Amino acid sequence: MLGRQLYQRLSPPLVLLGITPTGVEIAAHAAQSMTASFDVIVGAHVRVEGHGIIGAIAEDGDAVIDTHFEPTFDLMDALNAAIDKARRAVKSERLLFRGQRQIRSLGERTVVIVDGHLVAPWKMLASASTARELGAGRVAAAAAVSTQAVKEQLSVHKLEFICPSVVLDPEGHAHPFGDPQDPSAERLRSIVVAREAA
């Protein structure tokens, strides 16, 4: 369904970038059905204790932080530590998903950032920002399932969003894509798909 909507709304040449780990399989299958290019983009949430997810980082890009998060002076060290932790996570995930290979050239092409289940917009926004920095001509966001709140936040940031299933519950879909009982199995499948497809 997502692939069909992408095909109807965006014209080739397309590059689909699956956000690790939850967007990889969906992006790979959609790219295959559309004969589009596929790659992975590695992102990590920035989490501050007591505040939850307040932003994200993708690849080597700058951190994208929620504008509503206004840290006090004594939270600055915790924020910097959280950003450093996210950067370390991106570096280790990148080795697993792409090895030493750099992300494919995006020069002047339409790039679609794909995730499976969005309950926070930050990895998507960080990935879109990184894609623009890497030379993408047009950037769109896509997800199999998203919350209404995320859809609205992406709209505020003027990011074109394609999603066949938008739910009102802020927790997202009751049965999200992947295996909530064993997230490591989903992660392993995503690594295999990323290595095979790229």
Indicate residue ranges for each PLM-predicted region:
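PRPP-associated nucleotide enzymes
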Residues: 1-198
